[in-house]
């Protein structure tokens, strides 16, 4: 809304109402409202809102610097400093600071005086003392944040005095006034500080060392005005023996004050700088930090020590760094990292990482200090295991010399661990452990070596793009050598042999090195491109490593393998190298690069497991030779040669065997290699993959591929990042596990099988424990018999316990095998994804539909575990996104057309038999995909089948014509299949099929609508559920462009007429709904009718709507009687939407005054009913209305008692008000004919509105004589009426159409015009 210009004159009405108010009063109020809103937004918690409101306030005040708004703004902001909401006070303080900064002409002393007068500490009540204290504090802070306080000497002195006064209220403000005072004095000039210093700093050293703020003020003065401080206090040595305990107490207080803020107190860093300046850092660190704060066993003090350590790194020299990183602080930090493992515990490690990263990034030109800090943190170990993770992000800040030195240190520590140089510790739980093996040096060496090898791999993993190639090669050769080789005799040709082990490398450590090496291969071999998979020479990293391994194998006198090669295995290695040379001739082909990658990887695996990889390597070489030496493949239009070489099948088996191994690298290699050979895939090779995915085959039969359990390797790989918390809690966890097993065993023992029960009864009967009726007279069992019975029972229960354990082990074994099988199937799905992505036009893709559906169907029924969920999600993603929604598909079916038609029928039937809709949706989408394939293939391959059908007696008249005749799609068969499915969906109550399925069918294959839409039309007048579903489907289908394009104009018009006739038949019972189902039935019919109107209007179809209009008007009275039923508003809106399309406007409901309603004598019924909210008769004034029915004073005529019905309530009168106007005119209420239609006998045929206009005038419709001069609105109405029910846009203008609708309402009988007539008659009767 825009404000009125003050120069504009006011209207007479406004002048009368406003009196003597100024012309711009409204604009001033508008600005004031906007102005006041700023202060509300300033106090909101959102920072963006506060800043925006402050900026708008300043901009607003800049236009009125001398106005009253400035005074109000200052008053409002000062008031806000002491509001009850504590979160709003800093907001007002910041806004006041920015205001004072923007308007420098505002005197600070005046503002400070207003604050002190507003919040006078001497006169304020006790309940308001705390807000007043904070108001004064935030007021001073606002003056300081404006930047003007240090320049105004008078205001500065007053502020200092006020802060000193506020410092006495420590219970409320704590140390905030003193902190503010230190912050202010740190900004003032030296001359000002010399002048103020005697007033703020006492000469007593005890007071100076009593609080952090006093000490910080002392350090500030010592830094800026040392001469003045010396005159005031004298010479002071803070690090003397007497003052060290006081410094410790001050630092402890500072640590407690920032416990919630989690930051380093400024006083601690100032003391550190002072100690460095006075060359007293060793004394400060040893006595104050390590011997003082650290010994308190107070975690805030410990965190202060950690933060001080991190902040001190950039300030220390190399010698000082060595002092700090070998002390108790870093050891205590390591203990904290090891013990802080619970989710809710505070972890300082991320904060320390930030300190170290900042230090490394800031000293790029000093690699020695970088190396010293990184080595120091890597030397903090828990029984040999460093506390820093193997993957440490701060390594990326190392300069190249520091990185090279760090890698050299790691390699040296791996070969010759120096345990004495480590800052090693043990946790409390480890110290309590009685196991002596936990404290053996061999165990510490193993833990250290395992961490080092994974740290080397992580460095290459994170920095292999930035690292020098020589350094990467050093790490890779180091890992390869110590994974598979052992030094016999050092040689200069192999640098790795020059450094012997100080501790022998154990087999467990060598397995960790091997695992880390293959992880390194995954990093270096993820791609076939120049970076990162290849070196600068263009060869892959794996090729260089194979060449290095061949060099080691050739130096058998100096180096030997961990697992010695046999003659056959060495021949396989040599043949592999020969095959690599042959592949170099085909290096231009991408397939050759994939084969080379596979061959190199399996060749390296020959070093790890020679017996398993030897045969595999030979098969790969055979497949490579056949693949590269075969002739070009023939086109897909020809039949596949059954004598095709089986190299593809062999290679697929090899890839499946590689996928069975627990290696992500193998998974990537298998995926890449299969992408290059999938174009040569044969049905038998595909069947090998499907056998793995088929649940019936893979679960019931013995798998051809042995799946390897990867839990051990995963545990081995993830162990290096974990601390010793498992060992700390080992005893407690074992006790809990044993208790859990015992409880579980007891529960299982409760359900004893029948065989064990019979055996128990036999033993008891044999011991005469269960006798007959005369058992009481028998003697008790003797000791020998009792012992024999006990022994028998013990042996029986022991056997039962073994059986239970065996069943439990068998169940665990089956679950583990099932988990491994599911994991293997998830990996094999990689090959399926590659096939459907890279070869979607391959005919073999069609063979994947039912196996994938089988997996989805099984997983949806039993998707309890995470692996089942992963398998389901991956299968569904491949099926939906890569297969059914693929842009390309098979265009060469050959003789598969008949089988695909049968498969379509089978899939649709399976969809109708599924227990739920999600499963049915996948089957239905599969059938749509096959329809797309059949529709997109030419009929050349289907000629033979078509001829056979014609010979069998198929009517050629029903065969498709046009474009459909050129495809393989058998339209009659497909139509029959989907017609059956549609009928089942409409008639079956719990059908898994849904409306979106058939909408997808109609949109993708609209040619089927010619046969399926009549089924929907047939069910429009059926039972409740089929009618609702049919109407819903027709609503969506009739508006589809694809469906309309499949019908000729006469056919489409005929279909619209059929739908209109069915809907008209449904609407004959409109308004008679008694149940929810009947109400929904009426809603669906009206919705379909409106969709039909929109479709006809859009396409300009001509339909006869006379019968429909009569039906709708005939049901208007019954519809109004249920006007207030539940859910009827939607029904009325749809009804009048349809009537509006037919030219009938919805009557407006007007509220009438009580004076215009004729009064009537109240009936006894109305007198008995007491209305809620009305006065009783005894309380009403007597001079209200005469009891004998005489007219009232306002001249309104009273109706006779016989002409008025009994008085009813307001709601009843509103529901029946449509009947009253007709009675007021003196005519009986009858069913009104259509608007503009003459009253005729039932035998008279219905005429279109156009003929009615010619034969009869509009004025004669109501039986009244026509007027001499016809109004213009009626002429326009004749043009606006539908021409034989044509639903479309009229050529008239909008105004003409509006007048036409009004004239139609005027000429409509009874109900539509009764309200206007009655109102006119009442007004005429009231005139004298």
Swiss-Prot record:
Record keywords: Transcription included? Answer: yes
- One Pfam family this sequence matches: DNA_pol_phi
Cross-linked residues for Glycyl lysine isopeptide (Lys-Gly) (interchain with G-Cter in SUMO2) are 1148
Q: Which biological process terms from the Gene Ontology are attached to this UniProt entry? A: cellular response to glucose starvation; chromatin remodeling; circadian regulation of gene expression; intrinsic apoptotic signaling pathway by p53 class mediator; negative regulation of DNA-templated transcription; osteoblast differentiation; positive regulation of anoikis; positive regulation of transcription by RNA polymerase I
Modification type Citrulline: residues: 1307
GO MF entries = E-box binding; RNA binding; sequence-specific DNA binding; transcription corepressor activity
Protein modification:
Citrullinated by PADI4.
Task: Provide this UniProt record's keywords sorted from A to Z.
Answer: Acetylation, Activator, Biological rhythms, Citrullination, Cytoplasm, Isopeptide bond, Nucleus, Phosphoprotein, Repressor, Ribosome biogenesis, Transcription, Transcription regulation, Ubl conjugation
Q: Where is this region: Interaction with MYB?
A: 1-582
Q: Which residues carry this modification: Phosphothreonine?
A: 1190, 1196, 1239, 1244, 1269
Q: Region labeled Disordered — which residues?
A: 1-22, 698-753, 1146-1292, 1306-1328
Bias (Basic and acidic residues): 703-721, 1147-1156
Enumerate the residue ranges of region (Required for nuclear and nucleolar localization): 1151-1328
Q: Which positions bear N6-acetyllysine?
A: 71, 158
- Motif Nuclear export signal 2: which residue numbers? 263-281
Please give the Gene3D superfamilies that the UniProt record associates with this protein: Leucine-rich Repeat Variant
Q: Where is the signal peptide?
A: none
**Which residues are reported to carry the modification Phosphoserine?**
11, 775, 1159, 1163, 1186, 1207, 1232, 1241, 1248, 1267, 1290, 1303, 1308, 1310, 1314
Localization, per the record, is: Cytoplasm; Nucleus; Nucleus, Nucleolus
Span(s) of short sequence motif Nuclear export signal 1 = 240-258
Q: Where are stretches of biased composition, namely Basic residues?
A: 1166-1184, 1209-1218, 1316-1328
Q: Does the keyword Nucleus apply?
A: yes
Q: What does this protein do?
A: May activate or repress transcription via interactions with sequence specific DNA-binding proteins. Repression may be mediated at least in part by histone deacetylase activity (HDAC activity). Acts as a corepressor and in concert with CRY1, represses the transcription of the core circadian clock component PER2. Preferentially binds to dimethylated histone H3 'Lys-9' (H3K9me2) on the PER2 promoter. Has a role in rRNA biogenesis together with PWP1.
- Family per record: Belongs to the MYBBP1A family.
Q: What is this protein called?
A: Myb-binding protein 1A
This chain's source organism reads Homo sapiens (Human)
């Amino acid at each position: 809304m825009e404000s009125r210009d003050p120069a504009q004159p006011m209207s007479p009405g406004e002048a009368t109402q406003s009196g003597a108010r100024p012309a711009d009063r409204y604009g001033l109020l508008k600005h004031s409202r906007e102005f006041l809103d700023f202060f509300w937004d300033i106090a909101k918690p959102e920072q963006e809102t506060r800043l925006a409101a402050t900026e708008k306030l300043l901009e607003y005040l800049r236009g009125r610097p001398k106005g009253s708004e400035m005074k109000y703004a200052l008053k409002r902001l000062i008031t806000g400093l002491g509001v009850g909401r504590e979160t709003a006070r800093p907001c007002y303080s910041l806004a006041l600071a920015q205001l004072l900064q923007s308007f420098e002409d505002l005197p600070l002393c005046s503002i400070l005086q207003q604050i002190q007068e507003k919040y006078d500490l001497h006169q304020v009540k006790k309940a308001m003392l705390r807000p007043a204290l904070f108001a004064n504090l935030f007021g001073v802070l606002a003056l300081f944040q404006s930047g003007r306080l240090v320049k105004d000497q008078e205001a500065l002195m007053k502020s200092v005095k006020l802060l000193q006064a506020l410092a006495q209220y420590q219970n409320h403000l704590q140390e905030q006034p003193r902190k503010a005072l230190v912050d202010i004095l740190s900004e003032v000039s030296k001359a000002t500080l010399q002048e103020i210093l005697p007033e703020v700093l006492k000469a007593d050293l005890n007071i100076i060392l009593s609080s952090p703020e006093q000490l910080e003020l002392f350090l500030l003065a010592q830094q800026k005005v040392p001469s003045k401080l010396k005159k005031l206090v004298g010479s002071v040595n803070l690090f003397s023996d007497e003052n060290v305990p006081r410094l410790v107490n001050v630092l402890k207080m500072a640590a407690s004050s920032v416990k919630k803020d989690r930051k380093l107190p400024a006083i601690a860093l100032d003391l550190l700088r002072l100690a460095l300046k006075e060359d007293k850092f060793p004394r400060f660190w040893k006595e104050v930090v390590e011997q003082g704060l650290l010994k308190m066993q107070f975690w805030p003090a410990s965190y202060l020590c950690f933060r001080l350590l991190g902040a001190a790194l950039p300030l220390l020299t190399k010698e000082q760094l060595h002092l700090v990183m070998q002390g108790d602080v870093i050891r205590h930090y390591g203990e904290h990292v090891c013990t802080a493992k619970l989710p809710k515990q505070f972890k300082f490690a991320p904060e320390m990482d930030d300190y170290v990263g900042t230090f490394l990034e800031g000293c790029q030109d000093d690699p020695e200090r970088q190396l010293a800090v990184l080595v120091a943190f890597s030397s903090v170990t828990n029984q040999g295991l460093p506390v820093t993770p193997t993957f440490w992000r701060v390594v990326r800040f190392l300069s190249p010399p520091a990185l090279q030195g760090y890698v050299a240190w790691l390699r040296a520590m791996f070969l010759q661990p120096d345990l004495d140089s480590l800052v090693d510790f043990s946790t409390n739980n480890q110290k309590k452990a009685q196991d002596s093996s936990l404290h053996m040096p061999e165990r510490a060496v193993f833990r250290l070596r395992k961490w080092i090898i994974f740290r080397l791999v992580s460095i290459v993993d994170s920095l292999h793009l930035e690292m020098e190639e020589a350094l990467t090669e050093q790490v890779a050769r180091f890992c390869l050598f110590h994974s598979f080789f052992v030094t016999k005799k050092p040689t200069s040709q192999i640098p790795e042999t020059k450094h012997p082990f100080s501790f022998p490398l154990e087999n467990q450590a060598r397995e960790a090195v091997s695992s880390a090496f293959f992880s390194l291969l995954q990093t270096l071999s993820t791609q076939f491109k120049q970076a990162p998979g290849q070196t600068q020479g263009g060869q892959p990293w794996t090729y260089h490593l194979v060449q290095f391994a061949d060099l080691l194998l050739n130096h058998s006198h100096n180096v030997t393998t961990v697992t010695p090669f046999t003659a056959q295995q060495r021949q396989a290695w040599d043949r592999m190298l020969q095959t690599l040379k042959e592949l170099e001739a085909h290096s231009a082909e991408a397939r050759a690069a994939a084969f080379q990658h596979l061959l190199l990887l399996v060749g390296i695996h020959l070093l790890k497991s020679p017996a398993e990889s030897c045969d595999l390597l030979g098969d790969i070489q055979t497949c490579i030779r056949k693949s590269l030496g075969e002739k070009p493949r023939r086109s897909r239009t020809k039949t596949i040669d059954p004598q095709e070489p089986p190299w593809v099948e062999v290679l697929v088996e090899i890839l499946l065997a590689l996928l069975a191994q627990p290696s992500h690298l193998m998974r990537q290699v298998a995926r890449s290699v299969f992408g290059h050979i999938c174009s040569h895939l044969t049905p038998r090779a595909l069947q090998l993959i499907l056998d793995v995915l088929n649940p019936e085959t893979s679960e019931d039969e013995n798998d051809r591929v042995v799946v390897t359990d990867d839990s051990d390797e995963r545990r081995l790989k993830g162990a290096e990042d974990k601390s010793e918390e498992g060992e700390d809690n080992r005893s407690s966890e074992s006790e809990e596990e044993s208790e859990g097993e015992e409880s579980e065993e007891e529960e299982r023992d409760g359900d004893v099988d029948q065989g064990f029960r019979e055996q128990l009864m036999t033993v008891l009967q044999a011991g005469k424990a269960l006798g007959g009726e005369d058992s009481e007279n028998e003697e008790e069992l003797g000791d020998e018999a009792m012992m024999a019975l006990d022994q028998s029972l013990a042996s029986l229960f022991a056997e039962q316990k073994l059986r239970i354990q065996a069943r439990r082990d068998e169940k665990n074994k089956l679950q583990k095998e099932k988990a491994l099988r599911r994991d293997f199937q998830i990996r094999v799905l990689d090959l399926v994804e590659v096939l459907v992505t890279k070869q979607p036009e391959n005919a073999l893709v069609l063979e994947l539909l039912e196996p994938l559906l089988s997996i989805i169907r099984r997983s949806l029924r039993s998707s309890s575990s995470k692996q089942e969920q992963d398998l389901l999600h991956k299968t569904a993603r491949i099926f939906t996104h890569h297969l059914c929604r693929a842009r390309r598909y098979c265009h060469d079916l050959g003789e598969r057309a008949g089988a695909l038609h049968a498969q379509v029928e089978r899939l649709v039937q399976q969809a109708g038999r599924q227990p739920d809709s999600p499963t049915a949706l996948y089957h239905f989408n599969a059938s749509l995909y096959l329809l797309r394939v059949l529709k997109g293939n030419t009929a050349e391959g289907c000629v033979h089948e078509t001829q056979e059908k014609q010979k069998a007696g198929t009517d050629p008249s029903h065969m498709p014509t046009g474009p459909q005749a050129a495809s393989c799609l058998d339209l009659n068969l497909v139509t029959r299949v989907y017609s059956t499915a549609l009928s089942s969906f409409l008639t079956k109550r719990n059908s898994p099929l849904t409306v979106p399925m058939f909408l997808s069918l109609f949109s993708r294959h609209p040619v089927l609508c010619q046969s399926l839409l009549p089924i929907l039309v047939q069910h429009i007048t059926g039972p409740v559920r089929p009618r609702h579903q049919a109407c819903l489907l027709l609503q969506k289908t009739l508006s589809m462009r694809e469906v309309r394009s499949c019908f000729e104009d006469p056919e489409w018009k005929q279909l619209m007429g059929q739908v209109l006739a069915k809907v008209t038949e449904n609407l004959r019972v409109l308004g008679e709904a008694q149940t929810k189902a009947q109400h929904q039935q009426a809603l669906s019919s009206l919705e379909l009718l409106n969709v039909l109107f929109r479709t006809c209007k859009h396409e300009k179809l001509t339909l006869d709507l006379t019968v429909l209009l009569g039906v709708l008007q005939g049901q208007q009275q019954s519809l109004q009687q249920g006007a207030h039923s539940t859910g009827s508003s939607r029904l009325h809106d749809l009804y009048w939407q349809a009537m509006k399309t037919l030219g009938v406007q919805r009557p407006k409901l007007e509220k009438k005054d009580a004076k215009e309603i004729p009064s009537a004598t109240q009936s006894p019924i109305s007198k008995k009913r007491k209305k809620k909210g009305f006065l009783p008769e005894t309380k009403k004034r007597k001079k209200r209305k005469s009891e004998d029915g005489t007219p009232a004073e306002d001249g309104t005529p009273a109706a006779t008692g016989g002409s008025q019905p009994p008085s009813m309530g307001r709601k009843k009168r509103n529901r029946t008000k449509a009947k009253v106007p007709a009675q007021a005119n003196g005519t009986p209420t009858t069913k009104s004919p259509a608007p503009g239609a003459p009253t005729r006998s039932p035998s008279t045929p219905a005429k279109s509105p156009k003929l009615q206009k010619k034969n009869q005038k509009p004025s004669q419709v109501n039986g009244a004589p026509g007027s001499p001069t016809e109004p213009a609105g009626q002429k326009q109405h004749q043009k606006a009426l539908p021409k034989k029910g044509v639903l479309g846009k009229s050529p008239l203008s909008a105004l003409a159409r509006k007048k036409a609708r009004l004239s139609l309402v005027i000429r409509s009988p009874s109900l539509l015009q009764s309200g206007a007539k009655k109102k006119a008659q009442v007004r005429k009767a009231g005139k004298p």
